[in-house]
UniProtKB/Swiss-Prot annotation:
InterPro entries: Ribosomal_mL67 (IPR024629). It comes from Eremothecium gossypii (strain ATCC 10895 / CBS 109.51 / FGSC 9923 / NRRL Y-1056) (Yeast). It comes from the Eukaryota. The keyword ATP-binding does not apply. This is Large ribosomal subunit protein mL67. The gene is MHR1. It is found in: Nucleus; Mitochondrion. GO terms for cellular component: mitochondrial large ribosomal subunit; mitochondrion; nucleus. Pfam families: Mhr1. Keywords: Mitochondrion, Nucleus, Ribonucleoprotein, Ribosomal protein, Transcription, Transcription regulation. Its main location: nucleus. One of its GO terms (molecular function) is DNA strand exchange activity. Transcription factor involved in regulation of RNA polymerase II-dependent transcription. Also involved in regulation of mitochondrial DNA recombination, maintenance and repair, and generation of homoplasmic cells.
């Protein structure tokens, strides 16, 4: 099975583990529009875009899958494959809430320009990446076993002291800067996956023996 076909479907924890994937969730951002897509694998397909953009409109059109306009914004390492599936599902649920049942409330919180539209520069609307970071933080509040977020850059995570101090079990690292984005990003994501698999497979340190009184 190709990675493209594999990425187009929802994958349960057992499948991810049998297929040799690490317990991770990937967050990609569109360089032109600021839109965000979540994936269980280090790639995504048009089918995922169709499922993640529930009610597209002129301010939030379905984006293209062209690889040159997408960049990995964050990779999240979780303690287990079950936790990675739970995080992915929760992120998708929050996206659905913003776009469908709570759309009016979400629209009221988005920064507007003088014409009442979502603020943008050219085609880029930063509100989508900001909402994705807020949703990621909210979901990680409930993550079991801690997590490590590999960010595109320090700026992308927001104010660390203000937004992340309440999550001491979440560690933060930063992806190396890339020149040839498509090729180098693929290699870096592969390295992160291999490292996360080794960490997941490593035995937990033994608990200290109880001391007699």
């Amino acid at each position: 099975m190709s990675k493209t076909v594999g990425a187009s479907r929802f994958r349960p924890a057992g499948w991810l583990q049998r297929a040799g994937y690490a317990p991770q969730v990937f967050v990609f951002r569109n360089l032109e529009s600021g839109q965000v897509i979540y994936s269980q694998l280090p790639t995504f397909t048009e089918r995922q875009i169709n499922k993640n953009f529930y009610r597209p409109n002129w301010e939030n059109r379905k984006p293209s899958t062209r690889p040159d306009i997408w960049k990995c914004m964050a990779v999240v390492d979780l303690a287990s494959h079950e936790e990675s599936v739970r995080l992915y599902q929760n992120l998708c649920r929050l996206r659905y809430l913003r776009e469908v049942p709570q759309r009016k409330a979400a629209e009221q919180l988005r920064k507007r320009n003088e014409f009442g539209h979502i603020w943008y520069s050219a085609q880029y609307r930063p509100t989508y990446t900001q909402e994705a970071v807020a949703d990621l933080r909210e979901c990680l509040l409930r993550a079991r076993g801690g997590a490590t977020v590999h960010w595109e850059d320090p700026w992308r995570m927001g104010d660390r002291a203000k937004h992340w101090a309440a999550l001491p079990a979440v560690q933060h690292q930063f992806l190396p800067r890339m020149a040839n984005v498509a090729r180098e990003e693929s290699a870096i994501l592969k390295q992160l996956g291999e490292r996360a698999k080794r960490a997941f497979a490593a035995p937990a340190p033994p608990a200290p023996a109880p001391q007699s009184l």
